[in-house]
Amino acid sequence: MPQLEFAWWIVNFSLIWASVLIVISLLLNSFPPNSAGQSSSSLTLNKTTTNWQWL
């Protein structure tokens, strides 16, 4: 069984963790923040009736 080369292990370890952190930060920043005063869409539906509102 070949010996593990420590330098390549450190390089791969740091590259993988840097990639994971970049992907997580991109995913978290891709969603717009929801402010309390604004609704996420300008479309409002009347939910007091049982009829479907086709858009």
From Swiss-Prot:
Membrane topology: Single-pass membrane protein
CC annotations in GO: mitochondrial membrane; proton-transporting ATP synthase complex
Subcellular location: Mitochondrion membrane
Entry annotated with the keyword Membrane: yes
GO biological process, one term: proton motive force-driven ATP synthesis
GO molecular function terms noted in the UniProt entry: proton transmembrane transporter activity
Subunit structure, as described in the record: F-type ATPases have 2 components, CF(1) - the catalytic core - and CF(0) - the membrane proton channel.
The name this protein goes by in its record: ATP synthase protein 8
Lineage: Eukaryota, Metazoa, Echinodermata, Eleutherozoa, Echinozoa
